[in-house]
Every structure is written in structure tokens, then in C-alpha cells.
Amino acid sequence: VEKSKVSEKMGKLPLVIYSHGGSSTNIDNTALLQEIAAQGYMVMAIDYNFSLEAYGLTMEDATTLTVEAQKKFINQLVERTVPNQVDDIIYGLKEIQSTSFPLAKHIDFENIAYLGHSLGGTTSINASNRATPAKAVINMDGPIDPNTITKIKSPILYLSSYSPDLPDKILEGKGLPDANLYREVKKYELGNVTQLFDTRQDDAFWLRFKHAGHVDFTDVPFMIPMMTTDGYDKQQGHRLRTEVIIDFLNAYLKEGSTFEKIEDHSLAWIK
């Protein structure tokens, strides 16, 4: 950071705060974050040093493959981890606003967006209520905390993976050993997403990447090709995801831009 250089001609830059998913790190979306930074944003990616044990959870909780067990695990994960991660965001913001932080003078702290994947998406939405108010929030395939549904006021973009209503054969071809288990758990998650969008009339967008799996919203498929979901074009998917996200950020954090829905055969706008 000490050696980073920002052109004075740029003025103060909008800030995007990235939150990674559980059991991941803050480098899991480096390609996307570099693209965002290149468009004139300051980016802060927080590493939460996540572990199940730190929150009183176990690997058995995460891997008990029944619908009720997975619902319980999702709820416990959100209830126990997200408040702590939002505290980390609040602390991080305080630190970088300090005059001793080399880049503080280049950041527009009134112009902030929260972006996250999976549990980090949940964290991002909750941060928009508890931390510095957000001009925009982006959740990439993460759960929605039911306690925040009526509280979210910021413009929101939700990106979701392939539909749980696909036939068993297709779901199994995507590496799911139990298509029905996935279907029921995913529908449970999306129930809260649906409730959120039912309460919002303006500045709320829900986009499905029809062939993408959960991990495809990160850099992992590029680092470990075998992790790419069957039927998903990761090159095209990354390009489209980056374009949609940057267009959304530009519309709400920069003057003179409007958000237009990108059309492609691999995308489905739910709202």
C-alpha cells in the first residue's frame, strides 16, 4: 500500500469492499477485483480468517446431507458469522479512513459499494445496514438473512447460479450426487431471495447465470479447471459477470451512467 500510486487527476475514487465466502480467502475473486479497480475504483478485499470451529460449528454440521440438517447449518452460519464479519468491515473502514493510511485522501468514503460471494454476499447486504451506508450492494449466490429483508434500502444486484428446477439428469451431470437434496436446499435459500425482491420495486435486479455453479462466481475454475461446472463457459461467464457488475457499480457510484440489462442466451433476468 505504501508504494501504491494514484493519479491526482483521478480525484477521490469510489470504494468497493469485497467479502469472500466461507472457507475461502480474499484472493478468490482477484480477476474481477482487478477489473473493477481498472475502471476507477478503490478496492478493499477483507480476509476473514474463517473457520467453522471459531463459530462453534463442525465439518459434520456442514456435511450432514439431509434437507433439515442443511437448512439448520445455513441458518447457524448466517446467524453466527455474519455479525462478526460486518464488525470486521466497520473496523477496516475505520482503519483506512485514518490520516495515517497512505491512500485515505484518494477515497470517497461517501461513495461505497459492498460486493460479496456466498457467505460474503450475505455479509455485504448486512453491512449495508450496519456499516457505512452503501450506494450499491452485490450478492453473488449467497443466502439472504431473513432479518434484513425489509431493511435493505440500497440498490441491489443479486447473481444466482443454475436453477434448482432443472431435471435430475442435468443436475447430476453437474456433479450433484443427490439432485433432490440440492433442489430442496437451494429452493429454501432462494425463498428469502424471492421475498426480498417481492418487497422491492425499484433499483433491485436479479440475474441468473443459467449454467454456472456456485464456485463459478470465483476464480477457482481458472486455477483448478476440474472445478468448472459442466456446461459452463468460464471465459464467457467471467466476461459477462464482470460487465454486469461494473455497469451496475457505474450506474450507482458514478455520475452520467445508467444500468442496462445485458442480454445473452446464457443469462436469465428474473427481475
Q: What is each of the regions a protein language model found here?
A:
Residues 11-21, 34, 157:
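Short beta-strand element of the alpha/beta-hydrolase
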Residues 27-69, 210:
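Active-site machinery of serine-nucleophile hydrolases
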Residues 135-213:
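The feature captures the conserved acid-bearing segment of alpha/beta-hydrolase catalytic domains
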